[in-house]
Structure formats: C-alpha cells, structure tokens
C-alpha cells in the first residue's frame, strides 16, 4: 500500500499543494517553519481524523479559511482507492472513501494505517499507561476484527458503571453492568495479550539490532491481577470504587511494560537508547501488520537528523527500507538523510513558506 497522490488545501501554512509521492523513501526538506512537518501532519490527519501535534483540530485550518481539505489516492492490492476529508472550523468533519460518505473515523484508520516517529514519540514511554494502551490497541484493532466492537462496549459499560458509582448506587444495581463489563473486558484483554505476544517475537530481533548490548523485556499487564477472577474482583472492590467514584481496576488500566533488568526502561536507558527503543516498537508494529493482514503501514518520520546520530540514522533508515513500506521523512538538510541511505531517496520535495516543489 502506498500514497500515489496527495492534495492539501488550507492546512496550516500550506494554502494549496499537490504531491505525487513514490514508493519507498520520500524525503521532504526545508527550514524550520517552512511547512515540511505539516505535510506529515496532513497525511496523519487523513488517516486518523486528527493531528499528532495538537488536540485542537481547528488549529490546523489555515487562518484565512473556514475549512481544510485533504485528498489522496491509495494504491492497494485490490486497486486504487480515493480518500477525501474536509474539516470545518465549526468542528464538523466530512469523510468520503471512493465517493461514499463514511460515518466512523475508525474506517479511516483501517484504510490508511500510519506509524509516526517524531521528537515527541517519547510520550510512549514517559506519559503513563494511556499512550501505551493506545499503541497496543492500534495493533489489536488492525489484527482482529472483533476488537473494535468489544473495545467500544468496554468504554460504554465502563462509563455507565462509573456514573452509577458517582450516584452512590447499591451493588445490586451495578451487578448487571458488571456481567457485561466482565464479558467485554475479557474479550479485549485476550486480543490485547495475543497481540503483544505476537509483537514480542518480532521485537526481539529489531531491538537486538538497535540495542545489541541491552536486554529489554516487554510484557503486558491487563489492569487487574491475572490470578484473580475479574467478576469477583469487581464485587470485592465495590466499596473502594464507590468511595473513589470510578472503577479502579479493569482493561482501562492495562499497560505495556518495558524493563531492563529490574528497572523500567525509561530509568535504565539513555535518551538516545530510548529513542531507538521507540523506533524499534514502531517498526515491529508495522512489520507485524504486514504479516497479519498483508498490508503495509505508511511511516512518517519527522526531523530525523536532530533525533539520531549518523550511525543510528543509517540503521533506522535501513530498517525502514527493509520493511518495503512507503516512508515520508523530513529534515532541514537533505544531505543528512541522503548520506545515510544506501540508495538515493525515491523522491525529494523542497518546502518553502508552504510551497512544495518536487526535486527532479
């Protein structure tokens, strides 16, 4: 899978741009503030319906416009597919895939799987369990068609249960919801656990190349003691949950733990090693997607030269090239990327003040 055409209108400082990307490595270069990261952000927005730089999606709309428009042609195994997205300043989002209106943004993610490696990727290790759950759930969503339904039901039942707790409801009123909660929680947990087991098999080899002298252990924690029956736990913790006004244990507390010896990876590794660990996780996830559903991710790599030294840039770019996936990588100085590649980039784009030029 690859993007063969990308149109961007009124997205940040890009008033209008059309790119014809190539399979393989697409290098986008320009000075800070030129708009090169905005191209990556636009691709991500098209695949996720939101930005990886801001939680306020209206901010990505150009100041002179009331809406942004993104359009892409995808080359898929079954043929070409066309995706269009409009985001209005009012907050409304309009999505079409092959001319048909799409109601769920999850359909975008299913159609256009994206991996992002940016200077902010450290959030995966430092921001607490939520970002790591999202990492697991991205893979579980793509790997198992049952996951999304079970996950949305967990969220629905958990919301209802927490509302009852805040209202001071008796356990007899909560028990019905607990039966549903247990059923969907166990389904989500089984899929997550299986996914992490599969990821681990690939991850060992990639971490071995990036960090050959470091033994990183990766494990999944479900959000409650695995030796305890979840239904019993919910009943036994009712008084505690009632006092706090929310459900203390469950799949919403799951985590992906990375340890070196007895220490969390973020305490045991240097900043440079942690960068490589995050890169390894993203590459492993993309490779596993290809194995499981025969679909490539698209990789968006922002400001690579500032994040890794020359040796590790070369190693990362080799790993990305070996995936066979389409890659978009940004840099201020194109030589920093070109010199780290074994072969020239498939295509190069220069960005200046929001204007994009292909370099022949």
UniProtKB/Swiss-Prot annotation:
Q: Which InterPro entries does the UniProt record give?
A: DNA-binding_RecF (IPR001238), DNA-binding_RecF_CS (IPR018078), P-loop_NTPase (IPR027417), RecF/RecN/SMC_N (IPR003395), RecF_2 (IPR042174)
Ordered alphabetically, the record's keywords are: ATP-binding, Cytoplasm, DNA damage, DNA repair, DNA replication, DNA-binding, Nucleotide-binding, SOS response
Please list the coiled coil stretches.
none
Q: Where in the cell is it found?
A: Cytoplasm
Major localization listed first in the record, in broad terms: cytoplasm
DNA repair recorded as keyword = yes
One term of GO molecular function: ATP binding
**NCBIfam families recorded for this chain?**
recf
What does the function comment of this entry state? Answer: The RecF protein is involved in DNA metabolism; it is required for DNA replication and normal SOS inducibility. RecF binds preferentially to single-stranded, linear DNA. It also seems to bind ATP.
The similarity comment for this entry is:
Belongs to the RecF family.
Protein name stated in the entry: DNA replication and repair protein RecF
Query: To which species is this protein native?
Result: Shewanella baltica (strain OS223)
**Gene behind this protein:** recF
């Amino acid at each position: 899978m690859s993007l063969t055409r990308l149109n961007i209108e009124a997205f940040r400082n890009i008033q209008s741009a059309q790119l014809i990307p190539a399979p393989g490595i697409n290098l986008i270069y320009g000075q800070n503030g030129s708009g090169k990261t905005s191209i990556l952000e636009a691709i991500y927005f098209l695949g996720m319906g939101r930005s990886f730089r801001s939680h306020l999606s209206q901010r990505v709309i150009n100041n002179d416009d009331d809406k942004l428009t993104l359009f892409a042609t995808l080359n898929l195994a079954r043929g070409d597919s066309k995706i269009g997205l409009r985001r209005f300043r009012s907050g409304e989002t309009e999505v079409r895939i092959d001319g048909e209106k799409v109601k769920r943004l999850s359909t975008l993610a299913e159609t256009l799987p994206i991996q992002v490696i940016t200077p902010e990727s450290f959030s995966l290790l430092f921001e607490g369990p939520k970002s790591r759950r999202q990492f697991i759930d991205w893979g579980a969503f793509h790997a198992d068609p049952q996951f999304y339904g079970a996950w949305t039901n967990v969220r629905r039942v958990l919301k209802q249960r927490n509302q009852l707790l805040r209202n001071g409801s008796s356990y007899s009123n909560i028990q019905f919801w607990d039966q549903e909660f247990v059923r969907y929680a166990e389904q989500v947990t089984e899929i997550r656990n299986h996914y992490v087991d599969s990821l681990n098999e690939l991850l060992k080899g990639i971490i071995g190349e990036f960090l050959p002298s470091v033994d990183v252990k990766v494990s999944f924690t479900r959000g409650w003691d695995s030796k305890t029956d979840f239904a019993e736990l919910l009943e036994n913790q009712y008084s505690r949950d009632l006092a706090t006004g929310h459900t203390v244990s469950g799949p919403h507390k799951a985590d992906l733990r990375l340890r070196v010896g007895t220490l969390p990876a973020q305490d045991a590794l240097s900043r440079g090693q942690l960068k490589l660990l995050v890169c390894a996780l993203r590459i492993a996830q993309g490779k596993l997607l290809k194995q499981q559903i025969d679909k490539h991710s698209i990789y968006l790599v922002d400001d690579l030269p500032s994040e890794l030294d020359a040796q590790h840039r070369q190693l990362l770019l080799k790993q990305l090239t070996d995936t066979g996936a389409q890659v978009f990588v940004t840099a201020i100085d194109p030589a920093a990327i070109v010199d780290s590649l074994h072969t020239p980039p498939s295509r190069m784009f220069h960005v200046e003040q929001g204007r994009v030029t292909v370099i022949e």
